[in-house]
Every structure is written in structure tokens, then in C-alpha cells.
Amino acid sequence: MASSPKLFSMSILFLFALFSMQIHAREYFSKFPRVNINEKETTTREQKHETFVPQTTQKPEEQEPRFIPETQNGYGLYGHESGSSRPSFTTKETYEPYVTPVRFHPDEPYNSIPESSNNKDTYYYNKNAYESTKQQNLGEAIFTEKGWSTKENQNNNYYNGNNGYNNGEKQGMSDTRYLENGKYYYDVKSENNYYPNRFDNSRGVASRNEFNENRYNNMGRYHQNQEEFEESEEEFEP
């Protein structure tokens, strides 16, 4: 009988110690934050569904504000934004140079001649482009032989052939050296060049009138100075 109350008291003490240990354990673990396993799982699952968008992949329109010009015409080429509209003109891709139409003559020295020549009866040039078909450039033969003479006819130029310095032909109607029936005769060779001119006297007209004081007298024709003939005229009686 004596062992039963002892045993009862021991069991009561054991139960009391057990409950007191549970109370102290709760107080001890209450100091640490509680982590619920169910809440962890829900948070991780929610993070998997979220999509992370970096800032670099965002559109530039959202990053920078759109610039609007103050003018109504806008900016860029021809008042439009670059790339918004094409220019109003079109450029030709192929370029063909201008070529003068020519025809070739293998027999002629200059074989490249334009088809259209300047011919309106004023200045027409022949195919060789040197000599005129119409007598525009008369050269040295402009007047008659007794006026402005050519180079081939040197009857009255500088030296007058066999007649010494002067030609003994009759010099026009006013020449009084030869009259009717040979009544009057004048020795032409007696004029021994006493005049200050170098080659011919004042009566003669040299080529181009280069050495006469009476220069360009009546367009180079052989008109004589009547005053000098009146002084030197001699009468001859047969």
C-alpha cells in the first residue's frame, strides 16, 4: 500500500515537468520568425509566372519623347521627313552624249564633214574648207591689169620689162605724147627718173602704189598728172 502513493506522486511530478518543458520550448521558439512551408511554395510559383522585361529591349518611342517640329512643313528633304516621301523629280539613269552627224569621204584629206553646211549664197565653203567656190577671196587680182595687177602680170610693177623703168604704151585718153598722125611725139625714155620717187615717176602706178606719192589715184588706174606734162611737154615737127 505504501508503494502506491509514491508511484502516484512520481507520475504527477513527471506530468508537471513534461508540461513545463513544452511551455518553455514554445517561448524559446517564439523568438525566431516563423517560416511557413506552404507560403514558400506559393511565392515561388507566382514568381515563375511573372515575366521580367529589361530596359534595353523597350521601344525607343517609349524611352524618348517624339520630336515634333514647330514649322508646318516639317523637316528633311523638300519639307518632308527623310524616307516619308520620294523627291518630286526623277533622274535619268542612262546618259547619251550628243554626237554631231558626220559623213565620211575616204578620198578627201579631211573626212569628217557635217551634213549641214552654211549655204545661203553668202558664205558657202567647199568640202576642203579652204577655198571659196564663189570668188570672194580674189587674192591679188582685184582690178584690171593696168590697175591692181596680179603677181603673174608684172608689166607695170617696179621694173617694166624691156622698156627700162616705164612702159611706152599709151596711158589713157589724156596722154598727149601720142597724137594724131604722129604729129607730136614724146620720148618716154628721156624721163630718166628725175623724180624723188624710188622706182617709177608720178605718172606710173606701181603694183599696189607702194612707191608713188600720188597713191591710190582714181583706184590705181593710170591717170597722169596733167600739171607735170604741161611743164615737160615738147613739140616735135617732122
Swiss-Prot record:
Q: Which UniProt keywords apply?
A: Cell wall, Secreted
Biased composition (Acidic residues) is annotated at: 227-238
Kindly list the GO CC terms recorded for this protein.
extracellular region
- What ranges does the record list as Basic and acidic residues composition bias? 40-51
Classification via InterPro entries = Prot_E6-like (IPR040290)
GO terms of biological process kind: seed trichome elongation
Query: Which residue stretches belong to region Disordered?
Result: 40-64, 210-238
Q: State the name under which the record lists this protein.
A: Protein E6
Q: From what organism does this protein derive?
A: Gossypium hirsutum
Please state the gene responsible for encoding this protein: E6
